[in-house]
């Protein structure tokens, strides 16, 4: 009996060690900056491949050096990097929002949002601001924050945009940037100059996204690994994966929101957009793009996308 008890205790200890080790691995695999190989130059190359109609504008922007970069300092001392581009002085717009804050996705960088920069700047006549999120691009940080900590950095960028341009603004994000946008939207201290939000293929929560990827990539259930990993992350960074909830923040959002999602998205699965849309209690629109996978709605429907956003931003 004593030998059986000792054997059981050893097995339990080994299981705990295995789970803790797996949790550290998951944190490192999914969220450590050191695994990001994406660069700004790769982003420019992908833009040329996916959005060739924007190249004349982008080449002009780069050749003339009018895309300005800047750094700001967060309250905790982190340096955050971003780009901005003023609207053409003679470019008229009917949009109520004259400035767009454009937020990139997971393991991307600010330059990845230049296709929407083209849409807002060239097609809609807006100023644009494109931040590098925490642990992305030229911003400080070693671990990706899945939008939750990023929402507070985005709030800083909204204030920077207001100090630069003094105009009403729209916040528009893609993928993790869309989750950041939605998480920002429920903050109590939103700047009054934010008039609209646009989220394109964002997830309901960090928990839901990780649970799906754990199943898809490793064929593992959420329990117990994801629960333990979330606790580990909380000890490291002060928030859990369930706390990082876009759906709870959207329910508090007082501003109009446009929801966009590809109906063939299996990375942030399409089903997520429905509870998000339902949670928003104010003015809202939902647009599903037919046959589109993750984050490619503007790529395959550029005219319709531009028209949808233009119509949404009408006063």
Where do the protein language model's features map onto the residues?
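Membrane-embedded segments
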Residues: 74-157
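Short alpha-helix in the alpha/beta-hydrolase fold that links the catalytic acid
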Residues: 116, 246, 255, 269-278
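Conserved acidic catalytic loop of the alpha/beta-hydrolase fold
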Residues: 152-168
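Hydrolase active-site cap/lid region
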Residues: 183-239
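Short beta-strand/loop motif that positions the catalytic acidic residue
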Residues: 252-254, 259-261, 265
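Acidic catalytic loop of the alpha/beta-hydrolase fold
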Residues: 263-268, 295-296
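Catalytic histidine-centered segment of alpha/beta-hydrolase-like enzymes
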Residues: 292-302
